[in-house]
Amino acid sequence: MYRTLMSAKLHRARVTEANLNYVGSVTIDEDLLDAVGMMANEKVQIVNNNNGARLETYIIPGERGSGVVCLNGAAARLVQVGDVVIIVSYAMMSEEEAKTHKPKVAVLNERNEIEEMLGQEPARTIL
């Protein structure tokens, strides 16, 4: 049997742009993608901490070092520039793989710079 587990997370990213007229997706600074192992075209879930909205889309790599987190297309209706979001990717794996899997979590500051890298989420922690 296969299980779907969190693979990577960008925690507390700030929305830098919302572009309604783009085809779709989320544009994310490629340095952030590399740090947690996310890839172009990968399906992600985005949770908006400001309004509770949840959506699924796919990744487009953004300019390195820019800190860009831009929601494109219809998803732009669910965010405002400055909103705090959580971007999560998932992976399917066997139960054996799941037993040793360690997700990569990047905790970001208000400029979308990595403040801390976590190998797992500690229980009952507020970040």
From Swiss-Prot:
The keyword Cytoplasm applies. Pathway: Cofactor biosynthesis; (R)-pantothenate biosynthesis; beta-alanine from L-aspartate: step 1/1. The modification Pyruvic acid (Ser) is found at residue 25. Its cofactor is pyruvate. The active site is at residues 25, 58. Keywords: Autocatalytic cleavage, Cytoplasm, Decarboxylase, Lyase, Pantothenate biosynthesis, Pyruvate, Schiff base, Zymogen. It is found in: Cytoplasm. GO terms for molecular function: aspartate 1-decarboxylase activity. One of its GO terms (cellular component) is cytosol. Gene3D superfamilies: 2.40.40.20. Substrate binds at residues 57, 73-75. Its main location: cytoplasm. Is synthesized initially as an inactive proenzyme, which is activated by self-cleavage at a specific serine bond to produce a beta-subunit with a hydroxyl group at its C-terminus and an alpha-subunit with a pyruvoyl group at its N-terminus. The keyword Acyltransferase does not apply. Binds 1 pyruvoyl group covalently per subunit. Pfam families: Asp_decarbox. Its EC number is 4.1.1.11. It catalyses: L-aspartate + H(+) = beta-alanine + CO2. One of its GO terms (biological process) is pantothenate biosynthetic process. Belongs to the PanD family. Heterooctamer of four alpha and four beta subunits. HAMAP family: PanD. Catalyzes the pyruvoyl-dependent decarboxylation of aspartate to produce beta-alanine. This is Aspartate 1-decarboxylase. It comes from Bacillus licheniformis (strain ATCC 14580 / DSM 13 / JCM 2505 / CCUG 7422 / NBRC 12200 / NCIMB 9375 / NCTC 10341 / NRRL NRS-1264 / Gibson 46).
